[in-house]
From Swiss-Prot:
It is found in: Plastid, Chloroplast. GO terms for biological process: ribosomal large subunit assembly; translation. GO terms for cellular component: chloroplast; ribonucleoprotein complex; ribosome. The gene is rpl20. PROSITE patterns: RIBOSOMAL_L20 (PS00937). Pfam families: Ribosomal_L20 (PF00453). NCBIfam families: rplT_bact. SUPFAM superfamilies: Ribosomal protein L20 (SSF74731). Its main location: plastid. This is Large ribosomal subunit protein bL20c. Binds directly to 23S ribosomal RNA and is necessary for the in vitro assembly process of the 50S ribosomal subunit. It is not involved in the protein synthesizing functions of that subunit. Disulfide bonds: none annotated. Belongs to the bacterial ribosomal protein bL20 family.
Length: 114
């Protein structure tokens, strides 16, 4: 059986990883093994971060809605309950935008839901 030489393939692989590790400090951007570990860790963090971003934004929207609704003497949970009863189907992102950017409209929504 013929001997398989993998010089080009190994170089390509290492180059690809080092390219991804560009901008890392010290050996993390220069040495293949360490760079490989850091790239894998970074990819793991970015994957997890994409999931966490959704949670963080939802939490932010709820906080904003709660703050705006408390100015009108309602808690967040009471407000959402009233919206459900009144068939006002706005998601939390939209409600948050309205609460921050268009306060009179938000106050009207609260008045309608009461």
């Amino acid at each position: 059986m013929a001997r398989v030489k993998r010089g080009n393939i190994a170089r390509k692989r290492a180059k690809k990883i080092l390219q991804l590790a560009k901008g890392y400090r010290g050996a993390h951007s220069r040495l293949f093994r360490i760079a490989n570990q850091q790239v894998m860790k970074a990819l793991r963090y970015s994957y997890v971060g994409r999931k966490q971003k959704k949670r963080v934004f939802r939490k932010l929207w709820i906080t904003r809605i709660n703050a705006a609704s408390r100015l009108n003497g309602l808690s967040y949970s009471r407000l959402i309950h009233n919206f459900k009863k009144s068939n006002i189907e706005l998601n939390r992102k939209m409600l948050s935008q309205i609460a921050v950017l268009d306060i009179p409209t938000f106050n009207q929504l609260i008045a309608i839901s009461k």
